[in-house]
């Protein structure tokens, strides 16, 4: 690992030198480009496209294209790309990951490679983490693209198929990772070619790439339908589990996040449930419910893993601390938590289509990403995605000071020291941001600060609605902010305050309508009322800018923002994200982590050395400890967890790659059926396969004809073919010979001829046009149904295959063999079902309204999750946080537009 790190640093320095040469080439063009008129600048797009069509590679067009975008940005947005932003743009164009620190202007960087690659006409996808950022960036950066004659699209929640098609047809498309993934799945469930929305997956630029490709790597997007399973058993198990004793009846492994019944526990549960043998296959479902109830009670903690809000169990994102509205744990775990908390249980769902972010984004021809923290995961990006990480230098030197960890014997002593440190800094007026890893810890600290009389703000999943407001104020004089996991918070902390936010706050005070305020700081087309609001906003912004600039200088004199981490996260990257909240754009700042020897990280992964050290040290709880062993143990523990998590993700990917290959094959064949004009050759091939498989099953090669199963073949032909029942005598009559003289080829040809005659008769009865439509719809429905069943079967295989290790077999190899057999059986089942139903299907007049409703329902559906959760979109409450991610209440954000669209 250390060798990899050294090589990475050396390679990065060499890479930056190469990038500097490209920056020089762009800068040399700047004086000439600056002299161009607007019309001459706009003429650059068709000129560059002509060069591209003439065979010039994109790399040759890069210097001029980048210089053009830089100049247009300066004219329309008054923002000129810095040299380091040009570097970042080159890295993204090369299909790599650009690590750029917070505040370095990643949004503007993306315009450079997006413009260059959009010249191909194939569409560039810019992927953000929520609807709010996608909408903001598409409108804001859209000025650059529109000036240059390119169109922009927006893919967010709530659009119908026609709106999505229009957006995907654009040159540059902004959207969220969830929506891009769901559209891929929905396209592969479409019943008509006109319902397809996505073009081919050409080039994606992923913002916060570490969050999407690592933190959510194991998160599948799932489109689901409700299953018919009853919910009573969950309540039964929720009442049973509290009667069990930890260690006596079940064992909890916090490190592996597992819980299992002991022998004594099995006996106790059998007694309580009045079951003879809980391990018996007939009680498999009961045992599954029991295990999920144990997980819900012993592993899942309220206000850490989830919160209960408005009678619902809502997952808390372990990486960002945000509430994950609409996401649900799969496999019955969410229902088990609902039963534990005594809220209404929602039914389990059945998977209709699924894909992980890992596999979705690996389908792009070219993939690139941006983030503030990627270098610690460079090895994983390279091994799993084939993506190199380049650390781009900052525009101004980084002068933030990262202080050594303060280590305490106990958590209580640590929190007392944190409060003292906050009090001392607050007394001088220096703003302080405190990062905690759970809602529970943030509220403990908040109570301690309240007792000390220190005014402060709390930002955690419970106070999501105030998020933007709290973050915007965190850099002001005397501000104290407690935040659960600042990763991905999306709003810059500006020293002295954010003038844009203050201007909008003043407009709220003046009673401007919420929908007008929402548009005041935007850039898109608008009404006269909004145009007037934008004029007022600009005036207020200029006024507050003077105030915040003066306050900025005072905060700088105090040392900038001081950040306290109250616990080390499992991943160094998340710690670095917290640190990265200060020291933006050359501002001063300092960070320090306060750590206790009984924090989860050290307790679970620190090893026996820490336990022994705790016993040996007879020190005051409130005194910080400094010991080289502790610092080393911290780093070792984090590396150990990172390596473990990487291994888990790699292991999961090995299994997921198996089903991914099957998915690609089935979706490719499905698309051929969907878009095929004449499916007769496909049906003919299916009939040949059905005949061949039947003969193989009932008249196996190498077996004497007198031993063949003629009765079985006759019954099977009766199932497939319309009309009379087939008997062995019919076979003899049609072939003109006795059964002992049959050859396998005779039987195959007879069966195939009978199917072809039935097919021809069916087409003559219905007409060629109707027959083609029936073939297409029937095949698509059968493929979808069989694929759905196959996904369920693969899930069950994956759950049980690990036990093969006890038999000295490699579970992955066994999984590959069995899944291949299952896939072959599914294909055979699709062929058989299609042929059989084609001869029997009844034709009814098309129900246009129903068909349209099904399509609309599909676009309202969707899902993704944590580990394997399922999202099912529901009606959003007017006082709930807006699903777009803006942090505002739904009624004050997107409600009016949604109601207008619905009406």
UniProtKB/Swiss-Prot annotation:
Any one Gene Ontology cellular component term annotated for this protein: plasma membrane
Signal sequence annotation: none
Catalytically driven reaction(s): ATP + H2O + cellular proteinSide 1 = ADP + phosphate + cellular proteinSide 2
EC number(s) reported in the record: 7.4.2.8
Cofactor(s) of this protein: Zn(2+)
Membrane topology (UniProt): Peripheral membrane protein
CDD domains, sorted: DEXDc_SecA, SF2_C_secA
Binding site for ATP: 85, 103-107, 492
Keywords: ATP-binding, Cell membrane, Cytoplasm, Membrane, Metal-binding, Nucleotide-binding, Protein transport, Translocase, Translocation, Transport, Zinc
Enzyme class: translocase
Alphabetical GO biological process terms: intracellular protein transmembrane transport; protein import; protein targeting; protein transport by the Sec complex
Cellular compartment(s): Cell membrane; Cytoplasm
Residues binding Zn(2+): 882, 884, 893-894
Domain of life assignment: Bacteria
Chain intervals for the UniProt region annotation (Disordered): 863-890
Keyword Plastid attached: no
SS bond list: none
Listed InterPro entries: Helicase_ATP-bd, P-loop_NTPase, SEC_C_motif, SecA, SecA_CS, SecA_DEAD, SecA_motor_DEAD, SecA_preprotein_X-link_dom
GO molecular function, one term: ATP binding
Cofactor binding: number and manner: May bind 1 zinc ion per subunit.
HAMAP family attached to this UniProt entry: SecA
Subunit structure: Monomer and homodimer. Part of the essential Sec protein translocation apparatus which comprises SecA, SecYEG and auxiliary proteins SecDF. Other proteins may also be involved.
Free-text function comment from the UniProt entry: Part of the Sec protein translocase complex. Interacts with the SecYEG preprotein conducting channel. Has a central role in coupling the hydrolysis of ATP to the transfer of proteins into and across the cell membrane, serving as an ATP-driven molecular motor driving the stepwise translocation of polypeptide chains across the membrane.
Family label: Belongs to the SecA family.
Stored NCBIfam families: PRK12904.1, secA
Listed name of the protein: Protein translocase subunit SecA
Organism encoding this protein: Desulforudis audaxviator (strain MP104C)
């Amino acid at each position: 690992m250390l060798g990899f790190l050294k090589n990475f640093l050396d390679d990065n320095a060499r890479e930056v030198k190469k990038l500097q040469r490209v920056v020089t080439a762009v800068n040399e063009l700047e004086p000439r480009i600056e002299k161009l008129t607007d019309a001459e600048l706009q003429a650059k797009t068709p000129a560059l496209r002509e060069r591209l069509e003439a065979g010039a590679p994109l790399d040759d067009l890069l210097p001029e294209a980048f210089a053009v975008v830089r100049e247009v940005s300066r004219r329309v947005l008054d923002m000129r790309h810095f040299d380091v932003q040009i570097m970042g743009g080159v890295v993204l164009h090369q299909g790599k990951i650009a690590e750029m620190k917070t505040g370095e202007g990643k949004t503007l960087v993306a315009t450079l490679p997006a413009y260059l690659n959009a010249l191909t006409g194939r569409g560039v996808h810019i992927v953000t983490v929520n609807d709010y950022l996608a909408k903001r960036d598409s409108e804001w950066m859209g000025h650059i693209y529109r000036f240059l004659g390119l169109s922009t699209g927006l893919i967010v929640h709530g659009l119908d198929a026609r709106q999505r098609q229009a957006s995907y047809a654009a040159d540059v498309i902004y959207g969220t990772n969830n929506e891009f993934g769901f559209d891929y799945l929905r396209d592969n469930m479409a019943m008509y070619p006109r319902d397809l929305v996505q073009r081919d997956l050409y080039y994606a630029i992923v913002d916060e790439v570490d969050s999407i490709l690592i933190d959510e790597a194991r998160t599948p997007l799932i489109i689901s339908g409700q299953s018919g399973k009853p919910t009573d058993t969950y309540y039964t198990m929720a009442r049973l589990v509290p009667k069990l004793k930890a260690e006596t009846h079940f064992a909890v492994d916090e490190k592996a996040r597992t819980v299992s019944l002991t022998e004594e526990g099995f006996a106790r549960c059998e007694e309580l449930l009045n079951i003879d043998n809980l391990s018996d296959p007939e009680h498999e479902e009961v045992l599954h419910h029991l295990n999920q109830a144990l997980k819900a009670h012993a592993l899942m903690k309220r206000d850490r893993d989830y919160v209960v809000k408005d009678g619902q169990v809502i997952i808390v994102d372990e990486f960002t601390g945000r509430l994950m509205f609409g996401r649900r744990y799969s496999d019955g775990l969410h229902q088990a938590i609902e039963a534990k908390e005594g809220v209404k249980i929602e039914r389990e769902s059945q998977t209709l289509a699924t894909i992980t972010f890992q596999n979705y984004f690996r389908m792009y021809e070219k993939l690139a990403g941006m983030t503030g923290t990627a270098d610690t995961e460079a090895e994983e990006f390279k091994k799993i995605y084939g993506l190199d990480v380049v650390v781009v230098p900052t525009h101004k030197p980084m002068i933030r000071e990262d202080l050594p960890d303060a280590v305490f014997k106990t958590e209580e002593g640590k929190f007392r020291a944190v409060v003292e440190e906050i009090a001392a800094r607050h007394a001088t007026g220096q703003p302080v941001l405190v990062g905690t890893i759970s809602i529970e810890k943030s509220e403990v600290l908040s109570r301690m600060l309240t007792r000390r009389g220190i005014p402060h703000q709390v930002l955690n999943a419970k106070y999501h609605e105030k998020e933007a407001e709290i973050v915007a104020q965190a850099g002001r004089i005397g501000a104290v902010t407690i935040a659960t996991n600042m990763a991905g918070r999306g709003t810059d902390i500006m020293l002295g305050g954010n003038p844009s936010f203050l201007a909008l706050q003043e407009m709220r005070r003046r009673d401007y309508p919420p929908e007008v305020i929402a548009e005041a700081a935007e850039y898109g087309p608008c009404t006269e009322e909004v145009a007037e609001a934008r004029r007022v906003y600009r005036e207020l912004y200029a006024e507050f800018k003077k105030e915040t600039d003066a306050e900025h200088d005072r905060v700088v004199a105090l040392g900038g923002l001081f950040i306290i981490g109250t616990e080390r996260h499992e991943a160094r990257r998340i710690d670095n994200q917290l640190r990265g909240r200060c020291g933006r754009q050359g501002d001063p700042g300092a960070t320090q982590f306060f750590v206790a020897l009984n924090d989860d990280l050290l307790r679970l992964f620190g090893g026996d050395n820490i336990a022994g050290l705790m016993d040996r040290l007879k020190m005051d709880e409130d005194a910080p400890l400094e010991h080289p062993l502790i610092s080393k143990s911290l780093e070792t523990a984090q590396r150990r967890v990172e390596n473990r998590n990487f291994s888990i993700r790699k292991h999961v990917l090995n299994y997921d790659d198996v089903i991914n290959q099957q998915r690609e094959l089935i979706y490719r064949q499905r698309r051929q059926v969907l878009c095929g004009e004449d499916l007769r050759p496909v049906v003919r091939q299916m009939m040949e396969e059905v005949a061949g498989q039947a003969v193989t099953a009932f008249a196996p090669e190498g077996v004497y004809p007198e031993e063949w199963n003629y009765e079985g073949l006759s019954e099977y032909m009766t199932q497939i073919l319309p009309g009379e029942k087939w008997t062995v005598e019919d076979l003899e009559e049609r072939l003109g010979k006795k059964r002992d003289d049959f050859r396998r080829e005779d039987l195959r040809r007879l069966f195939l001829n009978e199917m072809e005659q039935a097919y021809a008769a069916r087409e003559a009865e219905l007409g060629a046009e109707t027959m083609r439509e029936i073939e297409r719809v029937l095949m698509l429905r059968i493929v979808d149904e069989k694929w759905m069943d196959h996904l369920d079967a693969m899930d069950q295989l994956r759950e049980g295959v690990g036990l093969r290790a006890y038999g000295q077999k490699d579970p992955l190899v066994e999984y590959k063999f069995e899944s291949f057999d299952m896939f072959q059986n599914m294909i055979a089942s699709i062929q058989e079902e299609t042929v059989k139903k084609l001869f029997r299907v009844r034709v009814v007049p098309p129900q246009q309204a129903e068909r349209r409703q099904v399509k609309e329902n599909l676009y309202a559906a969707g899902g993704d999750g944590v580990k394997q959760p399922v999202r099912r979109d529901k009606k959003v409450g007017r006082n709930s946080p807006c699903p777009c991610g803006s942090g505002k209440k739904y009624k004050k954000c997107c409600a009016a537009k949604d109601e207008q669209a619905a009406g």
